Amino acid sequence: DNRVGIVRDDQVLDVTAQADPGTCIPSLPVRLDLERCARRPLASVRLLSPVRAPGKIVAAPVNYRAHIEEMHKSNVSPGHNIPDIDRAGLFLKATSSLVGPAEGIAQRFLDRRTDYEVELVVVFGKSASEVSRDEALDYVAGYCVGLDITVRGTEDRSFRKSIDTYSVLGPWLTTADEIPDPDRLQLTLHQNGELRQNTNTSDLLFGVRR
């Protein structure tokens, strides 16, 4: 029922009654009276997207060095190779594609290859424009794990990545103060118990500060 909670160990503190949509995310635990919040076991709640309605979703294509090498070796590309991410630029995903980890993925275009990648998602807490790298992290509210789903084909990248449910975000938002260096995070993805992806954000071409 779209409630707001703060995760503490294996419990979720329900702060819906106190949460102000305009409140800066990183200061929520400080401003709220957590002692009088109702508590529920984390295992009993259904986790939706921790970001309800983002203004936009901006992504960088083929942003890991190892991924570029893999694509060249397997000759997998959306109709063309990406030799240089600086020339490829960033792209947008539809916000309507966003779901939480408990909502599931509705696969489309079953006659095509569909790929998936684990991603580090950076959530901005305030507007930013022409910010220096030294100040970049001051604008970050927190981080999430993302699952980016892609249908392979020759259409525009944004179209193939913007299908409903193809942007999974969660399991929750970790505030920026808990991650001092986002460029040293290990990301893994398992499918049915099998390790399918193992990478580190130190391998990013476009790092968080960039």
Model-derived features: positions:
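Hydrophobic alpha-helical segments and helix pairs
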Residues: 79-128
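A generic local secondary-structure boundary/capping motif
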Residues: 47-49, 78-81, 105-114, 128-135, ...
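N-terminal non-catalytic cap/leader segment that marks the start of a structured domain
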Residues: 1-88, 180, 188
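Short loop segments at secondary-structure junctions
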Residues: 10-11, 95-96, 125-129, 149-150, ...
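Flexible glycine-rich active-site/ligand-binding loops centered on an Asp-His dyad
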Residues: 78, 83-86, 90-93, 134-164, ...
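Catalytic-pocket segment enriched in acidic/His residues
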Residues: 37-41, 46-50, 63, 67, ...
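Residues embedded in well-ordered beta-strands
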Residues: 4, 119-123, 144, 188
